[in-house]
């Protein structure tokens, strides 16, 4: 089947905590669109799903990575970012066969001070903006290499008051989803 828009991603694209309504619903679901984002998704989950997807999209959004960047170690730089980028590259290779246009969204900043006490985590994990920044830099380079549009939402969110737009350490409230929709609309 052909869709104008599709999204693969994690809980932020799914709309966790917002009655499952995200920036994608706000901007695209009135069109021929398919939302394939799910809570807890990692890069490898998106790869498994996108390989099996028989649909074609005019524009496919990829918004995943934060769940891969959470670690059991309470300090930054414990994640093998190069391995994650290699996994993401495999996703992009398959995505190119499924969509005319691809947009890759950066991982958003996190509220480090709230880790590890997050109800949505099964175990204690930590997240660090230093890891997010490194990942985003490498992801932007990967997108440039593959001539895929990279949407830097991280920088825009760093200028906002995260206390007002986040409901926990990583998830956006309705106002946060609206801010992300504004970035997509630019």
What are these regions (language model features)?
Residues 2-7, 12-90, 94:
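Conserved SGNH/GDSL esterase-like catalytic core that processes O-acyl groups on lipids
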Residues 30, 35, 46, 140, ...:
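Histidine-centered active-site loop/cap adjacent to the catalytic His
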Residues 44, 69-74, 113-115, 161-166:
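A short acidic, helix-capping loop that chelates divalent metal ions and anchors anionic groups
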Residues 63, 105-106:
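Alpha/beta-hydrolase-fold catalytic nucleophile elbow
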Residues 74-81, 121-126, 165-169:
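Short glycine-enriched, charge-decorated loop/helix-capping segments at active-site entrances
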Residues 97-102, 148:
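A short helix->loop->beta-strand "cap" motif at the edges of active sites that frequently abuts
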Residues 106-109, 153-155:
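Short, well-ordered beta-to-alpha junction loops that form the rim of enzyme active sites
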Residues 112-153:
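Substrate-gating cap/lid alpha-helix
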């Amino acid at each position: 089947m052909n869709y104008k828009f599709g999204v693969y991603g994690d809980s932020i694209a799914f709309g966790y905590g917002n009655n499952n309504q995200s920036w994608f619903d706000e901007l695209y679901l009135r069109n021929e669109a398919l939302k394939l984002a799910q809570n807890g998704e990692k890069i490898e989950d998106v790869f498994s799903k996108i390989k099996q997807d028989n649909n074609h999209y005019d524009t496919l959004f990829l918004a995943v990575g934060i769940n891969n960047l959470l670690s059991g170690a309470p300090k930054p730089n414990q994640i093998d970012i190069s391995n994650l980028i290699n996994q993401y590259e495999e996703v992009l290779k398959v995505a190119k066969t499924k969509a005319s246009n691809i947009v890759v969204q950066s991982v958003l900043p996190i509220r480090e001070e709230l880790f590890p006490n997050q109800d949505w985590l099964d175990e204690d994990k930590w997240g660090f903006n230093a890891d997010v920044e490194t990942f985003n830099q490498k992801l932007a380079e990967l997108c440039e290499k593959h001539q895929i549009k990279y949407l830097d939402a991280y920088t825009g969110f760093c200028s906002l008051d995260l206390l007002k737009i986040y409901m926990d350490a990583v998830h956006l409230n309705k106002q946060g989803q609206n801010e992300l929709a504004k970035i997509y609309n630019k």
